[in-house]
Regions:
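Pyridoxal 5′-phosphate
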Residues: 1-261
Length: 261
């Protein structure tokens, strides 16, 4: 269960945690809103519980430091493409002493956990991408993404666009913005922007092509809330420039105002 800002209520999670629970799996950062979820609090809750604690850190890896030991994380998964590495490769961190059964049998690869020839080129590409995400690089990127987010929101406000931020402004990363434009169909807005060369979405890449509303927004505001059909997801990457964001912000403002008419 999440609140209207998309945040987990740890007290409710604690109440729902059964003594015989085997694993607890929580995202580090939501991939539609950019919200940072209370991993530290959940990790503290699980210190006295036998359940394995897994976090999907795909969206957050390379953006923020991941305090694995401090947060009592047992398993952590990432994907290389989120740090501009090759697609189709990732890794799973496993705490020392935790036993995992084999995923695929028949070979000695990956400590007998996944049989089959490793994709060495993709592995090396992932390692190279990871090596570039130093603490200094992460900090510089975070500051750049915050500037991009500020420019976008300030431009929309200056143009008189009615816009609302879906999510928790106090606990989120700036490279993902989930924006609601009241009275504007998100599907129509996406189509118009696509024709003008701007790529945004109504959800994550995992749900691309899905005509169903965002399950994330449904959990936040309910299935019948108009925000479900009036919200879009905007994300920034390391290759974006300030000039691109300024141009996109102006284009988005003009398109929203024209669509609302």
């Amino acid at each position: 269960h999440v609140d209207q800002k998309g945040q987990l209520a740890v007290s409710e999670d604690e109440a729902a945690l059964r003594p015989d629970a085997i694993i607890v799996s929580i995202m580090t950062e939501n991939n539609e809103t950019g919200n940072l979820l209370p991993i530290a609090e959940i990790g503290a809750l699980l210190r006295e519980h036998p359940a394995v604690f897994h976090t999907d850190a795909v969206q957050a890896y390379g953006k923020i430091p991941l305090e694995i030991n401090e947060n009592s994380i047992d398993l952590l998964s990432i994907s290389a493409h989120k740090i501009n590495g090759p697609k189709g490769i990732g890794f799973l961190y496993k705490r020392d002493g935790l036993s995992l059964p084999a995923l695929l049998h028949g070979g000695e690869q990956e400590e007998k956990r996944r049989a089959g020839t490793e994709n060495l080129a993709a592995i090396m590409g992932m390692a190279k991408a990871a090596s570039l995400h130093t603490p200094e690089a992460q900090q510089a990127a975070a500051e750049q993404y915050q500037t991009f987010a500020d420019v976008l929101m300030e431009t929309l406000a200056a143009q008189g666009v009615d816009v609302q931020l879906n999510g928790d402004p106090a606990h989120k990363l700036p490279h993902i913005l989930n924006l609601r434009f009241p009275g504007v169909s998100s599907d129509l807005l996406l189509m118009k922007l696509d024709l003008k060369g701007a790529a945004i979405s109504t959800g994550s890449a995992c749900t691309a092509g899905n005509v169903e509303p965002s399950h994330v927004l449904e959990a936040m505001v309910g299935k019948e809330h108009p925000a479900i059909r009036e919200s879009v997801r905007v994300s920034f990457g390391y290759g974006n420039t300030l000039a691109e964001i300024e141009a996109f912000a102006q284009l988005l403002a003009e398109t929203v105002l024209a669509t609302k008419k």
